[in-house]
């Protein structure tokens, strides 16, 4: 026990080590506070949805006047959907920083609404906003290098190693004990602030333990690299430069090159292209005979084929029908997009076994439900809800049932938990 206490005292007597531990603690706290503030801001925005939707619906309802046309209601009313953050999302913001977490949809063509502004390429975990995942993935290795690069060379350069070898000591155990103390100190400085904030955010105990275990494993990886370099017998300056170069390659260059390789190996149609194709299909419907549009719609949705035929005047059921036909027209593009995104995500996850920084990001965002899979699941919930909206308004339009002001409040409401 005295030997362990001696290692702790010796580490704390080093100004560099003490300053590094203090700085790491401050950065960990700052990253956690930043993540909590960002998620609190999103929760506040989501909490305001109900009141804002009620105001918007009241305005649309007031403008409805004496009309009994459900098509006007379907066209002018927006219906909010939202993707609430998980308790752990403060630690790994992930996709929530680049993908919409609130989406207002109408009972018109959905794919253009979903894919508007979909210009990001988040399939591979790379450097992003400053959060706890960023700290662990990119900054923590630098602190490991700062404390471990001279774990042996410092003794050699001061001549203490020769003296220590003359004593009845096992040098391997001495350096192992020293490395353990330094890694434990780094783990505590990064993990203790996380533990406090995670408990305050009511994160599940299993997730807290998983994050702490993940951080410990990541520390061991970088500590192992440092020990491999230290045992080469180089001086401290060469060790530091070598380890810094390894950090650049493993944490920055490697993931960036892998990202380029994955994008080239698995081409994916951009979401903006899907939105454009859907709009082109919708706009082209104005030049197609209405009977052809309805025939195509009834072939796909036979439950509405008994609807009264169109008259000479404009009818919203034709308008909503060709919007749905537009969605159906781009369904193969959407399926290909989804498949490509999932393949890229799987490739990035597999790459995490070769590049630990990528694996760290993938694991953290997966636990926090802020990864691409969580975003795709939100899109699936939006599609399910949009189908409910369409069925609701179709029930009026395709049976020529009058739509009155109280019917606005009877429209389906989005359930984020479904």
For the regions a language model picked out, list residue spans one by one.
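Transmembrane alpha-helical segments and their membrane-interface loop/helix boundaries
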Residues: 1-125, 240, 247-418
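Helix-loop-helix units of permease transmembrane domains in multi-pass membrane transporters
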Residues: 12-13, 146-187
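Hydrophobic residues within alpha-helical transmembrane segments
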Residues: 22, 180, 184, 188, ...
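Alpha-helical transmembrane segments of multipass membrane proteins
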Residues: 27, 31, 185, 189, ...
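Hydrophobic alpha-helical transmembrane segments that constitute the membrane-spanning cores
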Residues: 111-112, 173-202
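Long, hydrophobic alpha-helical segments
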Residues: 127-158
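Hydrophobic/aromatic residues in alpha-helical transmembrane segments
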Residues: 144-148, 224-225, 241
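Hydrophobic alpha-helical transmembrane segments of polytopic membrane proteins
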Residues: 211-233
